[in-house]
A protein has these predicted regions:
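ADP-ribose/NAD+-binding catalytic cleft of ART/PARP-like enzymes
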Residues: 1-33, 67, 71, 110-115
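ADP-ribosyltransferase catalytic core
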Residues: 4, 25-37, 41-93
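Short, surface-exposed beta-strand/loop "edge" segments at domain boundaries and coil↔beta transitions
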Residues: 14-19, 73-79, 99-102
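Generic surface-pattern signal
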Residues: 21-24, 51-58, 104-118
Length: 119
C-alpha cells in the first residue's frame, strides 16, 4: 500500500477559485514571481497564515482558506522540510517547475478545512 503524507496549504481567494475549478484535484501553476510552492506540515501553522495574514492582504481578497491534501510520501522524500520561524513552522519548498509532479502525486481530493474572512 502506498504511504501518504497529509499537508496543508493556506490560500487566498484567487488560488482557492483555481483549485475549485480543478474539482479540488490540483494546485494551479505558480506565477512568474512565485518560484516556490510552500505546502505546510501543520494545520495550526496553515490556520495561522490563513487567519492572521491572508485576511489582511488585499491580493488574497481579504480571505484565507486552509486546504488539506494527501501526497505520496515517496514524492516528498526528494524534498527537505524547512523550519521558518518557530519549530511548528515547517514547510516543504517545492520548485514551481515541479508543481505538476506534485499534483500528479496528490491522492484523493483537496479538502477545505477552514475559511477566514476579514471582519
Amino acid at each position: 500500500m502506498t504511504e501518504l503524507s497529509t499537508l496543508y496549504r493556506p490560500v487566498g481567494q484567487a488560488e482557492f477559485e483555481l483549485v475549485r475549478d480543478s474539482d479540488f484535484r490540483s494546485f494551479p501553476p505558480r506565477l512568474p514571481h512565485q518560484p516556490i510552492f510552500y505546502p505546510v506540515i501543520d494545520e495550526q501553522y496553515a490556520t495561522q497564515i490563513a487567519r492572521d495574514w491572508n485576511t489582511k492582504d488585499e491580493t488574497s481578497g481579504f480571505v484565507g482558506y486552509v486546504l488539506r491534501f494527501s501526497v505520496r510520501t515517496e514524492f516528498l522524500s526528494h524534498y527537505e522540510i524547512h523550519i521558518v520561524g518557530s519549530s511548528e513552522h515547517q514547510e516543504y519548498w517545492i520548485p514551481a517547475e515541479n508543481l505538476q509532479k506534485l499534483n500528479e502525486n496528490i491522492v484523493g481530493p483537496i479538502e477545505v478545512v477552514s475559511e477566514f474572512r476579514d471582519k
